[in-house]
Amino acid sequence: MKMNNRYFAALLGGTMLLTTSCSDLDTNPSGSTMGDGQLNEVLSQDPSKLKSEVSGMYANMIEYGAIIQWAGSTRHFDFGYASTMLMMDASGQDEPSQVSGYNWYNQPLRFVDRTANSQPTYFIWNQCYKNIKVANDVLKSVDLENLSDVAKSYVGQAYAMRAFEYFTLIQLYQFTYKGHEDAAGVPLVTEKTTEAEANNN
């Protein structure tokens, strides 16, 4: 009987330990992790810290494996803006290509990558809008009326990167001008666009 009591006590104690929760785990991260609000506060106080955000835009241009999570594995074209340039070259009408086992950019060459669920399309769309978001975050984090010279440099780079990414998108996804003179290009997201507007864009 004493042995059963010991097992019962051990089982009861184990159950109590496993079913109690730690309130320490319910806190927001602090220390090495910053939320958007904290980041904006730091950037507004010291605009030189914008350098890390702006550097992130350039790092996105050479990011390898950007769509691994979406695609399920790496893709041969998933190595940054250089790959986008190759796809744009392959999409031109002056690029002859024979079908071979090594034909990496055969989708753009055959114009079959123009669908919403195409991996090359997702790659380009994701790459461009990721940089547009970072540029918008830089622009949101500073007071555009009172900029220091350092902040002006970073804000200028953010505007330039955003314009460059829209230029890339419009070349690929805009209708031809003839017959579509009033057609919209690509969804426009700026630093002033709300989340609801972006979702309905």
Predicted regions and their residues:
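Sec-dependent bacterial lipoprotein signal peptides
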Residues: M1-T20
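A structural signal for short, hydrophobic/glycine-enriched beta-strand patches
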Residues: E63, Q69-A116, W125, E191-T193
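Conserved, well-structured interaction surfaces
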Residues: S97-L172
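Short coil/linker segments at helix-helix boundaries
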Residues: L172-N201
